[in-house]
Amino acid sequence: MIRRFVSICIQLIEDLLIGGWNSIWYYLFPIMHPRCANWWSVARWLQWLTFLWLSIGLIVLCSASYPSAQFEFNDGLYYVKRQLLWTILGILEFNLLTRLLIKDILKISSLGIIFSFLCLLLTFPMGISVNGASRWIAIGPILLQPSEIIKPFLILQSSYIFSQWDNISYSKKIFWVILFISIIGSILIQPNLSTASLCGAIIWLVALTAGIHWFYLNSILSIGAVTALISLGSQEYQRQRIISFLNPWANPTSIGYQLVQSLLAVGSGRLTGSGISCSYQKLFYLPIQYTDFIFSVFSEEFGLLGAFLFISLLIIYFSLGMIVVLSNKSKVNRLLALGCIMVLVGQSLINIGVSVGILPTTGLPLPFFSYGGNSILATFFVSAILIRVAIETEIDNRINIFSLLNKQSIFYWFK
């Protein structure tokens, strides 16, 4: 696997050096690369939608972050320029991963998850605290958020372990279950209930669709629910989020301020929006408008119509992802594709739900929209895995989806 990884890296460098501007163009815009012509059409559509999603996100980030960047750094494009640097790295990561076989990527998943877990543990003695939560560690000028980086490796490793559940030793099962619980517990202690819940949901749903016995699933679900309640009882800021969610207008200038301003932004957009870069709420009324609440700015500037079109993009993305899930004969590949969809689309819907007030404030970023290098790299990683699974779903190896409609349960598809 290491030889293949090195050979692909060397090939990428040779292509860039020999091919000149054409190669640079192809690697920065992989949707234009000739190799994509040989892919399954679903893989090509997923790649096009991924970069459409990214492009919309960069435009919205430019608008949402401009006032804050101008005020803080006297450079309105400060955040966008930094995001573009991370985006270029993410695209290179995307190119590399879509060239690797899934079986090769899975070989590094165990090392990746253990390394990410060790980084997660380092946030306790040497983490940088922001708003009472130590979620980042500094590596020179770069801030690393292990709880974000670990998401792709959780998808990879949980899919691999649960796809082989009946064929692995009891000690190996215990090791990975304890490690998964330790990871979620470490994220929860930071404290970061929303990310811990998302990671737990990923593992639980992958285990569910893999056919793990209901007794174990219900036991884990019960423990998770009790742990979440204990966390809510012990963390004041989490209780305040629930209270502000239930009635933000009761305290519109204190605990309900963030949600009230978000709702005002969404409502101000009406049908067609105020126009690109014409948001009023981003002018220091709506807090963290270029990260957690960037969808509120998007809704204000593009209106209900723009929000509807973006949600339609998510629905199409989800549908194409499910076609990949149902068409691939490999159990581990199906679980991988399902996990990727849950992170990309599920996290997006949670973020949107928070912005419009139907879910409590979580702090989860909107993939490809929210500012943050860790988020953009993790999102590119997850989307590359999904597209790589689609690429490997070759014509001769695909399942006839319509033949599955007569089965009694969707869990039949994962057997």
UniProtKB/Swiss-Prot annotation:
User: Which reactions appear under catalytic activity for this entry?
Assistant: [GlcNAc-(1->4)-Mur2Ac(oyl-L-Ala-gamma-D-Glu-L-Lys-D-Ala-D-Ala)](n)-di-trans,octa-cis-undecaprenyl diphosphate + beta-D-GlcNAc-(1->4)-Mur2Ac(oyl-L-Ala-gamma-D-Glu-L-Lys-D-Ala-D-Ala)-di-trans,octa-cis-undecaprenyl diphosphate = [GlcNAc-(1->4)-Mur2Ac(oyl-L-Ala-gamma-D-Glu-L-Lys-D-Ala-D-Ala)](n+1)-di-trans,octa-cis-undecaprenyl diphosphate + di-trans,octa-cis-undecaprenyl diphosphate + H(+)
Q: Where are the transmembrane segments?
A: 12-32, 45-65, 85-105, 108-128, 136-156, 174-194, 197-217, 283-303, 306-326, 338-358, 367-387
Keyword Transmembrane helix recorded: yes
Q: Where in the cell is it found?
A: Plastid, Chloroplast membrane
Could you identify this protein by its name? Putative peptidoglycan glycosyltransferase FtsW
| Function as written in the Swiss-Prot or TrEMBL entry | Could play a role in chloroplast division/peptidoglycan biosynthesis.
Where is this protein primarily located?
plastid
Q: Topology in the membrane? A: Multi-pass membrane protein
For this UniProt record, the keywords arranged alphabetically read as follows: Cell shape, Chloroplast, Glycosyltransferase, Membrane, Peptidoglycan synthesis, Plastid, Transferase, Transmembrane, Transmembrane helix
> Which GO molecular function annotation, any one, does this entry have?
peptidoglycan glycosyltransferase activity
Q: This protein's superkingdom?
A: Eukaryota
Q: Name one Pfam family in it.
A: FTSW_RODA_SPOVE
Q: Which family does it belong to?
A: Belongs to the SEDS family.
InterPro entries in UniProt: Cell_cycle_FtsW-rel_CS (IPR018365), FtsW/RodA (IPR001182)
User: What cellular component terms from Gene Ontology apply here?
Assistant: cell division site; chloroplast membrane; plasma membrane
GO biological process terms, alphabetically, are: cell division; regulation of cell shape
Q: What is its EC number?
A: 2.4.99.28
